[in-house]
Amino acid sequence: MLPLRAFARLAQRPRLSRPTQLARSSLPRPSPSRPAAHYLALAPAPSTRFLHSSPPVLKEKRWLNNTPPEDDGEDGQNPKQDDQVEKPLPDAESSKSAEERAKSQSSKPDIKASSSDSVSSSAPAPGSADGGSPPGAGGPKEVAKPVIPEIYPQVLAIPITHRPLFPGFYKAVTVRSPPVIKAIRELQAHGQPYVGAFLLKDSTVDSDVVTDINQVQPVGVFCQITSCFTSQEGEGKPEALTAVLFPHRRIKINELVKSSGTKGDGTVGVGGLVEGSQDSAKGEGEVKSFESEVPGVEEVREELGTVSIDSEQPDVHKENRDLETKEVTQIDFLHSLLPQVSLTNVSNLSIEPYEKDSQVIRAIMSELISVFKEIAQLQPMFREQVTSFAISNTSSQVFDEPDKLADLAAVVSTADVSDLQAVLSSTSIEDRLQRALVLLKKELINAQLQFKISRDVDTKIQKRQREYYLMEQLKGIKKELGMESDGKDKLVEGFKEKASKLAMPEGVRKVFDEELNKLVHLEPAASEFNVTRNYIDWLTQVPWGVHTPENYNISHAIKILDEDHYGLKDVKDRILEFMAIGKLRGSVEGKILCLVGPPGVGKTSIGKSIAKALGRQFFRFSVGGLTDVAEIKGHRRTYIGAMPGKPIQALKKVATENPLILIDEVDKISKAYNGDPASALLEMLDPEQNKSFLDHYLDVPIDLSKVLFVCTANVLETIPGPLLDRMEVLEVSGYVSAEKMNIAERYLSPQAKVAAGLEDVNIELEPGAIEALIRYYCRESGVRNLKKHIDKIYRKAAFKIVTDLGESGLPEPATPPAENQVEAQYPDIKPASELTYNVIPGTEVSGVDTKTDVTTVPREPMKVPAGIHVKVTQENLKDYVGPPLYHKDRLYTHSPPAGVSTGLGYLGNGSGAVMPVEINSMPGKGNLQLTGKLGEVIRESAQIAMSWVKSNAYLLGITKSEAEATLNDRDVHLHMPEGGIGKEGPSAGTAILTAFVSLFTKTRVDPDIAMTGEISLLGQVLPVGGLKEKILAAHRAGIKKLIVPAGCKPDIDENVPESVKGGIEFVFVEDVRQVLHEAFRGTEVEKRWQETLPMEEEPQRERH
């Protein structure tokens, strides 16, 4: 039993006090039990109550100075006065921080109390609710600072989210549940400000009550409520309570207390006495002797397990065997609030034994401290946290408290909740340190990255600040000099004025406003200023909603088209149809036309004529050899020198949204590593997509559906299929001789005359000369070469006029001296004679003549005398253009030898030609040799013809029996003259077959017969193309009969003019038998074939 005087001696033992340190909730703060304790007053009057950590019930009061109470009755007991009756602690007192009272007593020595004399820091001294001295006391009363109970079997559970709490670090939590708020206030009022904080497993749950033990993590912390205050989160919302918690140690949740638990009659809190209804009913006389009924320390530890015993305290178990009390839980008074609050049975989380001198632990702690130092160098806030921890650490060596070091590492890290909970739940110091080291290493990486980002941002900001400072100085200087405006305001106003005249779509207007607002806030010296200015300039240059009125007058269009071009009936008819639809509807949508034809037939120039007839603006660009997609779709704004694509440039140039855009040479687009421009044209030339064409530079949709696109190409084979499918193809065939004559007389000759300066000179170019040019110099299907020769004729004529008349006959016009003109117009310019040049010694300056005259006056044209007359005829034509290029139209004009036939070919320049086929044989091994720069297809045609002849050798009369072998001992050589010209295509099949039969039957073919057509292996004749050019070549060569496939008859009737077909007999065949009968008509072999190789029916004939 510990006598009463022992407590007095303990109260008199001095203890050094430590100053209270107040820190933020994120920094480590000292335990509320650490501030300097109050003196335990030994005044004669006040009574001291010794309480158990497990809710003890007061049995008897004893005065420490052994002074008996005054005798106020017969039984010697002093009845309790009204002002001396102890009441529960008010809420206001509980919210006051114990630190205020600790500060007032910080200079006084602390008293180290045992577990049996622990008093609550939130409770007042006995006899007064505000902690003052009771009436009649001789001096101020001081209360000893309590020791936090080591065992607290039952606590109020508070669920928390986001992060778990760690011992030694404050945390503020907000409670919104009214029952829980009431429970917290009850805890403070009863002097038991202790709760358990457990982390919710589901962070999305927002609850103040634990209904299931599996909702929270099994390991939490035992916390002391240091202060509380209420707050209103919003109008109409319930009041919330914010409580500041200080965790002391780790605890483990065992079970939830059910609502059927026993409710206590009263609870005595640490630091004060709260008497229940039963205790109030008892008189002071019923209280037994204090020393005889206080239980021993070991009994309390065994039965209740809630008393914290200091190692320096005397063994009270031996001196206080007779101390007994009634067992009740500390928070028995909260059972009435079940199940609206969560009460849990908990136990302390035990730590596995470890050795402080373990090399592993010391190594990990050393690494932790090293990482702490590295982070502290990068983050000043982190440095403050570590400093505060070092100050609050009670141990002189950090190696003595590895658990606190691990907790600090977890608190300052921004790790995942599961990782933090793992540190909290770990019972092994080594494992806890390992986990904390991992978290701190991650924090170091984040700190390094944050430091790098911060340093980069600071560098940029400093640069911008310096630029801004200099710009402000520049503005001030300009203001002093009267140059306040830097032009940006005028620029912005100009953009606004342009935009007000355009009908921008809503989306484009929004982008314009955003970019203009950005431009206003940018400095002109900034690099982004020019980028934004150029972008806004392009936005305002696009003709949004601006279009030109179209002319749908059909007669006017016919007049313009005929004035500019001769022929081209198909193209002109299509344009007139387009205008007729527009006249009926009142408006037309954009179309995509593709003009395909040989070079020089006027595909590009017809585009200009179409635009002129429709009254539209014209823009042309070529895609021949184009490899960059950006030329069509534009460049990204991030590139230096970026600009929109060709369609947007066209709209800017023509300043209207319905122009005619000519895309030249679409069959010559190339592919490269940076994309396929042909694929980029798909969006632009698709009527379903070009309503919202997206340029990479502007990055806003643009309507191209009103644009009339006209494309030109020489061949269709090289145009991608998807692109060709989006265009309406119009074939522009070559010109015949009559058409070339009209074009030369009406267009080419007058233009060449003006270009040569002979507009007023009497020069006559006779039609015979033009015809000779077409026949012997310019056989291509177009007129470009013809134009060159006519220009050459007029140049020669101009030179002849000047040389014949001489310099005296054409005197120079009177021109004032150049120097006088220059000096009069530009007085600041020095005369040429006064100009000086810096020349390096020992060198010469080429092209520098100090005496050279300069002038800005245009030269006057010379006047040719009226008597000059130049006449260009067929006879003197070679004096102007040289000897003829083509001497004769066909190689064999008379009866050719056996093995020769006449075919018709289509040349690469778009013209036709008469091509003889020559075959000869010699002793050999049955080989077939082909010469004449023949292509793969024409070689295959020769093989097919040879195979047909061998298979029908007996019927043709080449062999005497069907079993006789043919040509096994002879080689055959096939040649097509003009080997410099490449030849390709299947159309020479019938001519090659005829030449083979002529050679093997030793029968000649009439030279006035020409043929064309593809043959199959079984003798069928298939249609071919280029009939207009081939017939024109046959007409020019004087061919009398043409053998053509029957499938080509519609093409001949539609596209070949009558002037070309005149004098020619057309034979339309379907089988090679018909070809052979027609080519060898009237010969002996043909008569024999009527029996051995008869025709199924006579071929169709037409004579023109």
From Swiss-Prot:
Function comment: ATP-dependent serine protease that mediates the selective degradation of misfolded, unassembled or oxidatively damaged polypeptides as well as certain short-lived regulatory proteins in the mitochondrial matrix. May also have a chaperone function in the assembly of inner membrane protein complexes. Participates in the regulation of mitochondrial gene expression and in the maintenance of the integrity of the mitochondrial genome. Binds to mitochondrial DNA in a site-specific manner.
Keywords from the named record: ATP-binding, DNA-binding, Hydrolase, Mitochondrion, Nucleotide-binding, Protease, Serine protease, Transit peptide
GO biological process: cellular response to oxidative stress; chaperone-mediated protein complex assembly; mitochondrion organization; oxidation-dependent protein catabolic process; protein quality control for misfolded or incompletely synthesized proteins
UniProt EC number: 3.4.21.53
Active site: 987, 1030
UniProt GO cellular component terms: mitochondrial matrix
HAMAP family listed in its UniProt record: lonm_euk
Compositional bias of kind Gly residues: 129-139
Subunit structure: Homohexamer or homoheptamer. Organized in a ring with a central cavity.
Residue spans of biased composition, Low complexity class: 22-46, 104-128
Domain (Lon proteolytic): residue spans on this chain: 895-1082
Similarity field: Belongs to the peptidase S16 family.
Region (Disordered): 8-144, 275-295
Catalyzed reactions per annotation: Hydrolysis of proteins in presence of ATP
Main enzyme class: hydrolase
Name assigned to this protein: Lon protease homolog, mitochondrial
Domain Lon N-terminal per the UniProt entry, residue ranges: 155-444
The keyword Oxidoreductase belongs to this UniProt entry's keyword annotation: no
Recorded GO MF terms: ATP binding; ATP hydrolysis activity; ATP-dependent peptidase activity; sequence-specific DNA binding; serine-type endopeptidase activity; single-stranded DNA binding
Organism per entry: Cryptococcus neoformans var. neoformans serotype D (strain JEC21 / ATCC MYA-565)
Localisation: Mitochondrion matrix
Chain segment of the transit peptide: 1-58
Ranges of compositional bias, category Basic and acidic residues: 80-103, 281-291
Residues annotated as binding ATP: 597-604
Species classification: Eukaryota, Fungi, Dikarya, Basidiomycota, Agaricomycotina
